[in-house]
Amino acid sequence: MAPIPVVRAAIRRLRAHPPPPAQRIAIVHGDYRSGNMMHDGAGRMLAMFDWEMAHLGDPLEDLGWALDPIWDHFQPGIACGMLPRDEALAVWRAHSGLDVDPVAMRWWALFNSVKGRAIWTSAYREFIDGGRTDPVLAFSGWYLPRRQDAIIAAQLEGLA
């Protein structure tokens, strides 16, 4: 697979303009989104799944991943298909006790878009190499990269 110009531009941007220091270091899930949560139907989260990317870092990384437009379920501005973005940010602020620095959020949003693009590409590679036959992996290589590339381009345009 060939290098992707929009991803290369994003990586250059991330390297040239690192985020401000984290307000605090915390456990970062790495794939924090509604698809990895179990809840009771009344708004209480019961469990969080899929911890293979967990590490210590800036909690804004998880927030940026959860707010990536790739998870909006075709409802622009709706975080993870659940809440309006502003409401999701207010809930996060209230429960984390942290501010959401707009400069840091833009960095983490772009970082997570690049991370997502890498995930979709590697999942598709597993499918085309014949290692796995799950059709979700084929979808990962067909639709998600195109959408993520458009998201990255829009993010870069907003940073210019």
Residue ranges and their predicted role:
Residues L60-G97, F111-G130:
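Active-site activation/catalytic loop segments of kinase-like enzymes and analogous catalytic loops
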Residues M45:
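Conserved active-site segments centered on acidic
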Residues E126-A160:
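Regulatory N- and C-terminal appendages and interdomain linkers associated
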Residues M1-G30, D40-G41, G97:
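An alpha-helical support segment within catalytic cores of ATP-dependent transferases
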Residues D99-F111:
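All-alpha amphipathic helical-bundle segments outside canonical DNA-binding/catalytic cores
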Residues F49-A54:
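Activation of the activation-loop gatekeeper triad in protein kinase-fold domains
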Residues G35-H39:
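Hydrophobic residue at the +6 position relative to the catalytic HRD Asp in the kinase catalytic loop
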